[in-house]
Amino acid sequence: MSNLRRFSRSLAVAALVLLPFAAVQAEDTVEPSGYTPMAGESFFLLADSSFATDEEARVRLEAPGRDYRRYRMEPYGGVDVRLYRIEQPLEFLKRQKNLHRVLAEGQFKGEGLSNTLAYLWDNWYRKSRRVMQRAFSYESRQQVTEAVPELKMGNAMTAPTPYDAQPQYAPIPGLPLVSQFRYPLWDAKPIEPPQDVKLAGSSSEFINVVPGNVYIPLGKLKPGLYLVEALVGKYRATTVVFVSNSVAVSKVAGDELLVWTARKHEGTPVPDTKVLWTDGLGVMSSGNTDADGLLRLKHASPERSYVIGEDREGGVFVSENFYYDSEIYDTKIYAFTDRPLYRPGDWVSLKMVGREFKDARQSQAAASAPVRLSVIDASGTVLQSLDLRFDAKSGANGRFQLPENAVAGGYELRFDYRGQTYSSAFRVAEYIKPHFEVALDLAKPDFKTAEPVKGEIVLLYPDGKPVANARLQLSLRAQQLSMVDNELQYLGQFPVELSSTELTTDGKGRAAIELPPAEKPSRYMLTIFASDGAAYRVKTSKEILIERGAARYRLSAPQRFSAAGEKVEFSYASEQPTPLKPSSYQWIRLEDRATDSGPVADGRFALTFERPGTYSVELRDDKGQLLGATGHSVSGEGVKSVPGTVEVVFDKPEYRTGEEASALITFPEPVEDALLSLERDKVEATALLSKGADWLRLEKLNPTQYRVWIPVREEFSPNLTFSVLYTKGGDYSFQNAGIKVGMPQVEIDIATDKERYEPGETVTVTLATRFAGKPVSSHLTVSVVDEMVYALQAEIAPGIDQFFYHPRRNNVRTSASLAFISYDVALPGSTSAPGRANRSERGVKVLERPRREDVDTAAWQPELVTDAQGKASFSFRMPDSLTRWRITARAIDDNGQVGQKKQFLRSEKPLYLKWSGPTRFRQGDQPDLGLFVFNQGEQPVKAELLSGPPGSQRSQTLELAKGVNYIPLAQQPLSDGDWSAELRQDGQVRDRLAVRFNLLADGWQVEQMQNLSLAAASNPLQLPADARDVRLRLADGPAAAYLGNLDDLLEYPYGGVEQTASQLLPLSIAYPALAGGEPRIRDRLRLIMQNSRLRLVQMAGPDAWFAWWGGDVDGDAFLTAYAYYADWYASRALEIQLPAEHWQRILEPYAKQATQTPLLQRALILAFARDMQLPVNTLLGGLLNDLANAGEGQARAEPLEADDGLVLGDPDSAVGLAAARVLAVDLARQLRVAVPAPLAAQAETATQRLREAGLPFTDALLASRSAVDGQQASALLQRLAPAQSTLERALALTWLQGALAQAPQGKLPQPPKDWQAQRGASGETYWQWRGRGIPSWVDLDEAPARPLPVALSYRSAQAPSGQLPVQISRRLLRLVPGEGAFEFKVEEVGDKPLSSDELYLDEVTLNVPEDTALRYGMLELPLPPGADVERTTWGIKISGLAGDEATTLERARNEPGELFYGVPVDSLSGEQRFRHLVRFSQKGSFNLPPARYLRLYAPEQQALEAKPALAKVKVE
């Protein structure tokens, strides 16, 4: 039947050809078949290696095997594969833009007519049989089929037409077709990892076996280049297959390429191979390999290039090369700081030295040039920029101060030198004073290996009370002392497992600890986290040295390898005087851990290693303590390297010019040949293992080991790379080993007159520099830093020798042609031309220690020059701190030779005093004072303590236990002035301590001012009886008055957005005039600007808008503009460049909030923008129209006072509108914007209203419209007072900045008795009253030549002029720890005394009538001395505040003050509640004033707590 059907189909085809088409149409219609051509799915095709002629070539196909896409491919029956041979392979490859993905256009023809004709024939066949059935009766048909069974229809009438998937692409014309076949893709075994692949310690199922991911075998092919075409439906992918018995290994450098061609299996050279070096766009160079298979090609190396080649057999290969400069020879600037870690507010000292390198060896001094330094904090903000001068010989040095609010993290020093940018780094961490002290009392001062470390952790509150039941968490990390190759250094920190990591203190605040013994000399870093239930833990770290006095012996042999059975002489010598002597050696064979030992004596011993391998030889004393170690390799039969690697061991770690370097080469298998080369900036020399060369000697030791000798020449320094490369069995491997040529360094000797000093003593450091054993004059930079800084942060800057003369990196990159990957992704075909692609084709809490000075850098000498004899010295005062200090000296001479040395000294004192309590009190306070006495000895001692104010000291006898002792002091009446303590032992003074007490008034005080004139020798003063902080300042002339007001602004206690900007704005304006004065004043002003600017940055809200006190709340258009205005002036003063679009942001909130913003604030915003050179004409037109239509403003019941704020306090008043009109009209005239007629008519009336108001702010606004003489400016500036709005004072100073240009008219004489001369932030001198009582006269030595105008300021109580309708209620709740961490319950304190070891919740509730809304207020809450508000409330939950559920405390928001804290209240309406965590550390009895709420822009309007909840506080 099948033969009959095929014959019938042939007839049907003939009928279609011969019969007219119309005849076909005459037949019955054909029903739809429902058949659609097989489309297929996308797949990947790739060749992941090259093949030799005896290997079966294959390609990899990755088809989607686990989703619906598989079912779109599976009916195709597999994948059609066609294999073509490319006749001119190099020409073909040269035309390719991407050798990984070659382009070979397909000939898409579609499926063809075979399936269509099959369906038509079956359809017509059925119909014809039906016709035949109707022509004959059933009986006739039955008789015929019985006679001829072949004529039976069977299932032919009902069986569906079978369809065959045909290739839809024609063969590629012009390419010989080697073979084609359909590979059963879905029946083939997928690629899977070997059965024995198991990865210990991780999942071995990381590779899933996926159907459709298969290798397709192509058979063994002749040498050449082949193209593989894979087809599935409309989808087609191509890739190339390289078949060659040769492999090309390439070494690319900056301007050349070395190619070595070798047999793939044997590894022997292949000569006369044609090689092309291309970058994908064209051939850069070409040539043929020589008899050794080597070829050098010259050309500048691109980042990516290819080597394509064809050997004499026709084999084709390709390798890909990547090049980048590892070592760049240019000017190197070595920049480092005095220490790696700083705290906010610290001074950072830095030094730069430089050399200009011509190549790896030659350098000259970097040229003198200016350096622009930028300091960038951890958030990426530029803090400041400095201009330094770099000198060719001495380099550059500078210093700057970090802001007090500097963020923690890594900081960058970025400096521009001669058009290039360099960088260095340091870190900043904030150390917070803990609310209790953590001390570690060790059982003994020194511990040895194998000995447990025992001791006690002691926790004490500042008042000496023990911290009972505190939870401790311990973390121990060990740094082992390394003695490999005689280098004694601490290795990386590794955690040490503790038997118990959590402890609890007993009733005495003590917890015993026992740390595991160290097996080897180590440094233990014990970190302790202690918590008494506070919101955060106290962290402290302690350094414990295990056998810190261990000797260091240098152990060496003539060479680092030998032959098996060869006698090796080892020698050893101590590097420092020590009583420890070696008694034995021990060797360990690393391959099997076999070991042996023996005695040593007289500084040498001999060993004979019978078995080849790698050995570690150690030197130990009679206690088994490690004193020295070295490594040794032994050659011999059977030694192999790890498979896939080559081992190269040189006999010495370092050589001198003229010596011969000997290396032992070990291969993992016997090899016939290998490529040996010397490399650095290019391949300097080559040799074959089978032939050798004139630059080396070779000796074959056994089939896998060779020995090579290389004479060391001068040009090898500082180092050269020796490379060994071989290829065999289809793999290649290479190993680089460095030949280091020793470069002499500047040797530095550091000597001090003794090893231990007491605080306050003068330390003299003597330095000596030598080069090649002879004295040499050098430039030294020396720092003396607290060693614990390096325990927190290791040195960031590399050693100066490592920076300038580090081993040069190898600039040669090695690659091979063995694993070049070519790939393609299958895409559907189309009979139309493809569209052009629219793309380019081109490719912490502080460590608490006995210290009274927070000094981390004791001395810094940025430029110390030794004389011709190499001598120099310097001295410094030992800081008042007991610790170990690290002296680091870095040297560089005029020839560029460098050196570095570090040494240690200690500051120690047997008995040490430390004050831990507060020094500020209120009048009438009765504190229970005490201090800490540290007994640094090992035994308890007796001593005598004298303490008290001068003239009335009291004596008490002390029994001082080892460690820290808290000593309570007898109660004495407090007074302003000095207080001292003196500790005596055996009639000698062991330590002294001095503090100064300040007594504040027992109630609220405000700063007040009087303008006086000193005209006689004796001048009366009229001060109230409660006056405090009395100051006298010169107000003679506008400049003095201006700076006096600037000082008042800078001393303002609060720091919201407006207050910070009000400090920053006038200071930035005055800074250029003040920067030319005293450097100390300049640096301080610069720091204040940085602090203020950084605080503004930190208070920025969403979209960089600003609210009154920052935070994630809706920004305010006026405050945003004001902050940017101040920052604009500050950035110019600090020389910080910001993009122009940055300043455009002030107009964004104006556009959104103009209708809700008061007109006065809108006028000021546009005035700010005008000063910042922003376009405002259109916005000004809108403001002018709104002002023309505005009324007269809101009427006030009472006239404005001088202390009332207008801009933020009452901008819509009549005076506020008048100020807006005057500002806007003046601005319109400057910009030539038309003023509406109604507004022009109102202008004069507005000006007159401002004159009548008589406010300092409005008078300053009027004065800014015209020139003001010095007398007028001085009079106006003297009217500004600290009680007035900071915003309006700042704007007045901005408008009157011309007063700074006028020369000062006089200066204060020498202060009389009891007055002390001090200087404000701006550098202006003032007198501070230091006498007893209140001054009533100012007595001068003589009458001044003319009356001197002065401003007398003081703090005194003042009754508020207005009582606000605010009810204040305050309560203090004790926190009782709950079951979980950071969970508490509360209980009322009542009349019970407070405890210094507990935590309290301070809750304040404000209530105002519902129809009242108050803006911009401050809630001030008094605290007793020693009380602190916890900085964070994160994670704390408190139950019992409102209902049964626990309440999570909101984020703490407060401003610190003198014996109080403030809470900013942006808007007050209804009832608001504020909660803060408070701790009371000072014992005693204290009286507190009531809490108060005041409006910051109308400070005379206040509300006081009616019944003070904390009027009397007793702390026990």
From Swiss-Prot:
Signal peptide span: 1-26
Keyword Cell membrane: no
Organism: Pseudomonas aeruginosa (strain ATCC 15692 / DSM 22644 / CIP 104116 / JCM 14847 / LMG 12228 / 1C / PRS 101 / PAO1)
Name of this chain's protein: Alpha-2-macroglobulin homolog
Gene Ontology MF terms: endopeptidase inhibitor activity
UniProt keyword list: Signal
Family recorded in the similarity comment: Belongs to the protease inhibitor I39 (alpha-2-macroglobulin) family. Bacterial alpha-2-macroglobulin subfamily.
Transmembrane segments: none
Top-level division of the source organism's lineage: Bacteria
Keyword Disulfide bond appears in the UniProt entry: no
